[in-house]
Amino acid sequence: MFESKINPLWQRLILAVQEEVKPALGCTEPISLALAAAAAAAELDGTVERIDAWVSPNLMKNGMGVTVPGTGMVGLPIAAALGALGGDAKAGLEVLKDASAKAVADAKALLAAGHVAVMLQEPCNDILFSRAKVYSGDSWACVTIVGDHTNIVRIETDKGVVFTQADNAQEEEKASPLVVLSHTSLEEILAFVNAVPFDAIRFILDAARLNGALSQEGLRGSWGLHIGSTLAKQCDRGLLAKDLSTSILIRTSAASDARMGGATLPAMSNSGSGNQGITATVPVMVVAEHVGADDERLARALMLSHLSAIYIHHQLPRLSALCAATTAAMGAAAGMAWLIDGRYATIAMAISSMIGDVSGMICDGASNSCAMKVSTSASAAWKAVLMALDDTAVTGNEGIVAHNVEESISNLCSLACRSMQQTDKQIIEIMASKAH
């Protein structure tokens, strides 16, 4: 619709955002297994009787401690069971959105009977891997997802192979909407945000709608660690100031509380993560309200935030030892700085200060405590913006921060890609030892 009005680079950037910014119900690692189970069950005619599943260490890490929406239960087994018994394989990251109360009860009964097993895939060279084998009588179906939360690469049944992606994997990689990110820069992203027609990016306002609703739910209910609602009470007690900084902290935390606590509301995700989507959205929304931004300014700020977060995360493994709420918050820093100042120099300084501040935060699995890291990252982003507005930032003389923001980002991502791989293994070992 808009192709004739905008240049090809802008169109590719829009496609990259549409690829990476999608609604997701529930933490995306257990949801990936739920999708595999749902797709396997869809190949069978009879009643689901048993499920065997295998996942990569990173997916196990992010699935052990998080609540599956609508179940009140934690972990990968309930995700697999509910996916098979009540999931919609065509709904992607919203696979569980229409799961009925009966499906939840049946899934819990399947678990109680000991008919669901989730195991580590060994050996496993894929960071993101989930496989579900679903049995019905003498029939079975097996679905494998690799590389991305919804990327089904193989469907097989007792009658033979139904689908395999292996034959056209290289062509699909070349055609990926994310390829453009390897050939652009933050400065080009800012130029795009400033000039692209509003109607071409209006869709990003859905992120504000979905993640704003999660934030409101987090403040209403007692979800997860209820950080947002707890801090709101401390405001009423006079222990926290009722100001813009606190509002960013409370409203962003509340959305993650609801998300990780199992609220049956979708998040608008970023780079396959609901918490990253929340972190890239809610702080920008709060600042936009504060400055009286209209829908167009909000859309441009959100587009800058989400696209910057995608741009940085594209240089990382899909899952790693680095908490990606930090990189999503770098996007939020860009969006907030743009709303107040608009200069590239301010945005670059804010991101550099973020890299000098929170870059060492580890990911120790998806859980209610993710809301702590989301709130920390959002607060750090606002602090970095305030510093940048006064032309102050962590400089290239300090730590891993370089003299230009692109090199700083590269330094951060190289740590996650190389040095932090051993850290990730040790985190998984510690978590596995706790589970036994």
From Swiss-Prot:
InterPro entries hit by this protein: Ser_deHydtase-like_asu (IPR005130), UPF0597 (IPR021144)
Q: Which domain of life is it from?
A: Bacteria
Transmembrane segments annotated in the record for this chain: none
Give any GO molecular function from the UniProt entry. L-cysteine desulfhydrase activity
A Gene Ontology BP annotation from the UniProt entry: L-cysteine catabolic process to pyruvate
Q: Which family does it belong to?
A: Belongs to the UPF0597 family.
Q: PANTHER family this protein is in?
A: UPF0597 PROTEIN YHAM
Report the protein name in the record.
UPF0597 protein YhaM
Which gene is annotated as encoding this protein in its UniProt record? Answer: yhaM
